[in-house]
């Protein structure tokens, strides 16, 4: 973080609700210092009433913002424009000068390419139907996933996501649980790492976890136990932050350097 805030200091921040746990200010303030950027990153923890009252003001004074639960979809109507990916996904998690982007989507594509590469022939099960689920479902579909199954507590949100995916030419449906026997990729985009049954994990080629505190959730522990490839929530958090900084500054600190810093500060375990 900057030792001194001055007239030229740029404002960045995270908008969400009940986000006391977030690591985003540590990640971005570390990056700003490392890159020599005169900027500060703050957290704006807003209930719905406060969000509606101050979002336009924040968009005017902030150089860039990140957006998390529950505002990834709601924020779009306040923006001047959105890029191709976030428009299709209908969710934004990064803003630069009132333009919206989705770096969750970019992070999933980046990380899955490293772990597996082409997804042709894989069946993908996405637990959850919110903004993160949308980003993951679109990323996996674009990497070639043959089908996307949405598993969610309520059918209303699941139906909306399935319709959105099918409208974009992908093969999506609602399932109560995973019932395939091979070539499965499982994504947990919910706050509950226990939502994915162990027998589903056993059949998977890759599991993807959005929860990052702790890094080794029950889902990740089971993936390790059965020798399954995995992408943990910290990898996603850091990579989407790096992609956001590329949008803001056309440069960033490496994923590895940020993760090393977070562990050194004992901010993750």
UniProtKB/Swiss-Prot annotation:
Q: Which UniProt keywords apply?
A: Amino-acid biosynthesis, Aromatic amino acid biosynthesis, NADP, Oxidoreductase
The pathway noted for it is: Metabolic intermediate biosynthesis; chorismate biosynthesis; chorismate from D-erythrose 4-phosphate and phosphoenolpyruvate: step 4/7
Which Pfam families does the entry link to?
Shikimate_DH, Shikimate_dh_N
**NADP listed as a keyword:** yes
Q: Which residues form the active site?
A: 72
* Residues noted as binding NADP(+) in the record, renumbered to the chain: 128-132, 152-157, 210, 233
Q: What is its EC number?
A: 1.1.1.25
The catalysed reaction is: shikimate + NADP(+) = 3-dehydroshikimate + NADPH + H(+)
Q: Which Gene3D superfamilies match?
A: Leucine Dehydrogenase, chain A, domain 1 (3.40.50.10860), NAD(P)-binding Rossmann-like Domain (3.40.50.720)
InterPro entries for the chain? Aminoacid_DH-like_N_sf, NAD(P)-bd_dom_sf, Shikimate_DH-bd_N, Shikimate_DH_fam, Shikm_DH/Glu-tRNA_Rdtase
Residues bound to shikimate are 22-24, 68, 93, 104, 212
* Keyword Chaperone listed: no
Task: Give an example GO molecular function.
Answer: shikimate 3-dehydrogenase (NADP+) activity
**Gene Ontology BP terms:** amino acid biosynthetic process; aromatic amino acid family biosynthetic process; chorismate biosynthetic process; shikimate metabolic process
Q: What class of enzyme is it?
A: oxidoreductase
Which family is annotated?
Belongs to the shikimate dehydrogenase family.
Q: What is the purpose of this protein? A: Involved in the biosynthesis of the chorismate, which leads to the biosynthesis of aromatic amino acids. Catalyzes the reversible NADPH linked reduction of 3-dehydroshikimate (DHSA) to yield shikimate (SA).
Subunit structure of this entry?
Homodimer.
Q: What protein does this entry describe? A: Shikimate dehydrogenase (NADP(+))
State which gene encodes it: aroE
